[in-house]
Amino acid sequence: MSEFAHSTGQFARGWKGNEARRQEFLRRLVQIAVNYVGCWIGAAMFKSDYEKADKVYRVHEFLQPYPFCSITCIALASEWATRHHLDYLPMEFVFEAGDEHWGQLHQRVLEDYKQAPVARAKEQAMALQVADFAAYEIRKVYMSVDEESDDLTSRFRTTLGMLVVNIPHKWGNMTEVGIRTIMNVRGIPKRSSP
């Protein structure tokens, strides 16, 4: 996806500035995802919400932002499988190799789910490329949004809109209150008062 976004590699010739070609390519890629993806799940958080919650609870000692969102995705995927009576099937928790704080994520998944997450390169797992595309689109929405008042749906690009409308999904932004609630439920200690 990064080669496409920057018109490099296999997209170096004839792609840069050719918006009609780029949009048609994206539309076709999204249609493939619509045809083959049963559900997509994602979690995001504003750094400011994470830092506010970390002032109250020992959040960063428990989970850094990437592992926090990853664990949330695993929980949502497990809930989806149960709700659709698919929880008897084995589930792999696959994440892109080389992601930050992998050790923390690995440890937490082992403790919570009694199985290790799997690290794979994007080239080895097509699903990671689709997930990377969706994450890129969602990140663009969140990076341009006013945390307090903006309507996210007005920011959807056509391709992201196609994903949202056509594939069952569960994703959203984790707020300070949500992070603090999770810390409380998990019994993570509060910070000592100065």
Positions of the model-derived regions?
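Phosphate-ester processing/binding pockets and catalytic centers
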Residues: 1-194
